[in-house]
Amino acid sequence: PPRSTLFPYTTLFRSENNGVYGLTKGQFSATAEKGLELKKQGINPFLPVDIAMEALASNATFVARSFAGDPKQVKELLKIALAHNGIAVLDIVSPCVTFHNHENSFHSYSFGKSREEPLHEISFVPAREEITVEDFEEGTSREVTLHDGSTVILKKLEKDYDPQNRAQAFKMLAEAQMNNELVTGLIYINPDVINIFDMYNLPDEPLNRTKVEKMRPSPESINLVNSWMF
């Protein structure tokens, strides 16, 4: 959501993306691919909205895409997104087996299983837990330390990809779109983002759980403020 990303809140936007509105009997959604044909809707004449691309353009500081048929990856990406210190957008391609599971569709289960191109293998290591790294038989690994001390370990597969490079993320998504590939994984992350709580020195404790005594200024503080005003 472009408007939401203007303010650096700690928020996760998770999309269960299947390309249709199932509750209204299979209408095209904004992410339905152009040329898709559905029984009750005909042929879609519009270009799809790429959620990951929109999130990048709107300055989200965590952008990822996964496929519901890869639950291990979904689980790890959710952990990282929830630990992220800024705006996180996770696009989960989730096939609708009732209204939109055509074999050649980007949002179908068979397409996802056969055309998925993972950028890397992902492991999430929460902060304050013992960190162990096993020997890797192939490839190299890259550690990305999040704001709270948590670490994301990326094991590179075939692609030489840096998820902290925003320009490279745009290029990768554009190439995947041209090649009709479903690229999944951590697309972009800014581990050094400062959220609105840090900017304004706000407490972690929710206001509705903060005791009145803690919120009410002391008489000395009130007198000091009054002296500045009058």
Which residues fall in each region the model found?
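Short, small-residue-biased leader/transition segments that mark boundaries at the very start
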Residues: 1-12
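Short gly/pro/ser/thr-enriched loop/turn and capping motifs at secondary-structure boundaries
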Residues: 18-23, 97-98
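A glycine-rich helix N-cap at a beta->alpha junction
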Residues: 10-20
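A conserved active-site cap/scaffold subdomain adjacent to cofactor or substrate pockets
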Residues: 84, 88-91, 115-119
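Short, surface-exposed, charged loop/turn segments at secondary-structure junctions
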Residues: 27-32, 71, 79-83, 101-115
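Active-site-proximal loop->helix
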Residues: 23-35, 54
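Flexible, low-complexity linker and terminal segments
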Residues: 98-230
